[in-house]
């Protein structure tokens, strides 16, 4: 649902449920991928939203997941990756939402 709301083009979805709990999964999208790993016993989830191009709205996906998990603390960091590494442009990583 997060990928759909973010306007991603979904190619494939693969999830694995661990015993006794927890999941790992990836949503492959035409623009790259979204992945998640959860540790319910620690009330923790790690989510990556990777995108190339300017169609995907990662902030929409992130907001949806924060709401669905009823997260009490979040840390969201936007990172520049990929082709910028070979250019003269400086790479700027910034916290989008500080840990709260």
Locations of the language-model features?
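Polybasic/polar functional segments that serve as interface/processing modules
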Residues: 1-100
């Amino acid at each position: 649902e997060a990928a759909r709301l973010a306007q991603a083009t979904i190619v494939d979805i693969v999830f694995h449920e661990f015993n006794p709990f927890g999941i790992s999964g990836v949503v492959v999208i035409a623009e790259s991928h979204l992945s998640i790993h959860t540790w319910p016993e620690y009330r923790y989830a790690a989510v990556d939203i990777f995108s190339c191009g300017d169609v995907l709205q990662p902030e929409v996906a992130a907001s949806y997941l924060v709401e669905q998990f009823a997260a009490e603390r979040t840390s969201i960091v936007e990172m520049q990756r990929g082709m910028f590494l070979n250019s003269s442009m400086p790479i700027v990583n910034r916290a989008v939402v500080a840990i709260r």
